[in-house]
């Protein structure tokens, strides 16, 4: 009998209960005891196995993006981009690729309400013929920090106080006062966009700058953007309290119910393209993740559409065990020197190995749907059937060879080894422009949220003065209004 033929699956369920090893269980209601009221016997293997499995049901929670919901569907190319990339799944209009998508909140725990003011994750796994491609982004196009060295710190600042386990504004504004590049992100988080109505009415962004490479080896910087066909809708504070008070899983339920009813969510994928030769023409660094690219100069170009038409079959197997990593790319798509992207490439795969084990890419939801071959073997929870005698490379006894080469970025890097900030920080221009683009009532709501955060009694006069000086440099009127509301005299 082939032990690998019938892998564990509900498709092989028996009509009666069994142990994990397949032995029949004739009583799944009572423990084995000495007499009807006697002590339980240690030899009750089924009881021990049942309890031991129960005790180990929970796996480590994601350090960020713990609260999430997933759905499956397809991505279809609608516009020709073969002049920009040799990626097989983007080779021509009409090509469809199966996908799974996970939406999430970022900071709060696995069971937290989906109505909290928080960025939202928007991660897409493409199961292409050349391997998986993970586009791991958020609903906002920018982030709080530009260098991954600060990533643990920004997460710690937003997470609950380690002493009281309460999320506190003084900790957030204390840390962010040291990273003024965060101001642009705050104009998204404290804006009306800060609480999406649900996942279907939410934009997505790749956030980081990637590269596309065509067959000739020409490289372009690229930004990815998802636009929902049903529009963007958000909740104001009073609406969020009402919705969250009646259903703390409202966004998950909305996604699940919409797909079940045949009302399939859809997003259009757009890209912005920049020639690396032109990167010095801007007053910001195009690889700075705290900046957006101006759409009037670098317009959005349509690529395809994402349709989610199938709910997941099991929440644990296809949401909790679903794992993404920005390092998982395919030929025709690669990385840039974006400092945050460079650190995410390591951190994401490392946290998956911690949560799920070294063989997490063997889990069905994470495994590629195309043929694949390497000598990465053994380790905890390895369930791949292998019968090779050669587990090294190269070998004259094994016909496996290197794959055909494909174009990769080949820019020459030069410079001295140093730890430093980028030359073009320009932290205040874009947040100021964004604030001035809003209607007066929207500006007022943003100001109220800012005042509320900076009114935390543990925020010092010095800290408020720093924040006022920052916002004055973004927009003088905004900074002066903030100073008046906080009863603080501006220092500049």
From Swiss-Prot:
Gene label: CAT1
GO molecular function, one term: catalase activity
Active-site residues, Swiss-Prot/TrEMBL: 65, 138
Enzyme class: oxidoreductase
List of residues binding heme: 348
E.C. designation(s): 1.11.1.6
Gene source species: Ricinus communis (Castor bean)
This protein's name: Catalase isozyme 1
Localization, UniProt: Cytoplasm, Cytosol; Peroxisome matrix
């Amino acid at each position: 009998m082939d032990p690998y033929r019938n892998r564990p699956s509900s498709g092989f369920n028996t009509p009666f209960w069994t142990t994990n090893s397949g032995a029949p269980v004739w009583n799944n209601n009572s423990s084995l005891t000495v007499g009807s009221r006697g002590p339980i016997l240690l030899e009750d293997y089924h009881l021990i196995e049942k309890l031991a499995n129960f005790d180990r049901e929970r796996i480590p929670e994601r350090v960020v993006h713990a609260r999430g919901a997933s759905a499956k569907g397809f991505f279809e190319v609608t516009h020709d981009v073969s002049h920009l990339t040799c990626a097989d799944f983007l080779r021509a209009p009409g090509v469809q690729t199966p996908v799974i998508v996970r939406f999430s909140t970022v900071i709060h725990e696995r069971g937290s309400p989906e109505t909290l003011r928080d960025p939202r994750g928007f991660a897409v796994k493409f199961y292409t013929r050349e391997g998986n491609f993970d586009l791991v982004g958020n609903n906002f196009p920018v982030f709080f920090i530009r260098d991954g060295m600060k990533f643990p710190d920004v997460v710690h600042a937003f997470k609950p106080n380690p002493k009281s386990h309460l999320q506190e504004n003084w900790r957030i504004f204390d840390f962010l006062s040291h990273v003024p590049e965060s101001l642009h992100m705050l104009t998204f988080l404290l804006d009306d966009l800060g609480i999406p109505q649900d996942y279907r009415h939410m934009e997505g962004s790749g956030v980081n700058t990637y590269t596309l490479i065509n067959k000739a080896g020409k490289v372009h910087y690229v930004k990815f953007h998802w636009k929902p066909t049903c529009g963007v809708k958000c909740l104001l504070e009073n609406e969020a309290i009402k919705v969250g008070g009646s259903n703390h899983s409202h966004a998950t339920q909305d996604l699940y119910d919409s797909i079940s009813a045949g009302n399939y969510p859809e997003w259009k994928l757009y890209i912005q393209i920049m020639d690396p030769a032109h990167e010095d023409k801007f007053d910001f660094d195009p690889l700075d993740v705290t900046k957006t690219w101006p759409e009037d100069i670098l317009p959005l170009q349509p690529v395809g559409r994402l349709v989610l038409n199938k709910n997941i079959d099991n929440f644990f197997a296809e949401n909790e065990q679903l794992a993404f990593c920005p390092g998982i790319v395919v030929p025709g798509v690669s990385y840039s020197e974006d400092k945050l992207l460079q650190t995410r490439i390591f951190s994401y795969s490392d946290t998956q190995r911690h949560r799920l084990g070294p063989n997490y890419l063997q889990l069905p939801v994470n495994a590629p749907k195309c043929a694949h071959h390497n000598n990465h073997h053994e380790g905890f929870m390895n369930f791949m059937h292998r019968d090779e005698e050669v587990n090294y490379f190269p070998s004259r006894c094994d016909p496996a060879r290197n794959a055909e080469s494909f174009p990769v970025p080949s820019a020459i890097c030069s410079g001295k080894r140093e730890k430093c900030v980028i030359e073009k920080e320009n932290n205040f221009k874009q947040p100021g422009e964004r604030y001035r683009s809003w209607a007066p009532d929207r500006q007022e709501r943003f100001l109220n949220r800012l005042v509320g955060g900076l009114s935390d009694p543990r925020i010092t006069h010095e800290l408020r003065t720093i924040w006022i000086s920052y916002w004055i440099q973004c927009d003088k009127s905004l900074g002066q209004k903030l100073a008046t509301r906080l009863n603080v005299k501006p220092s500049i």
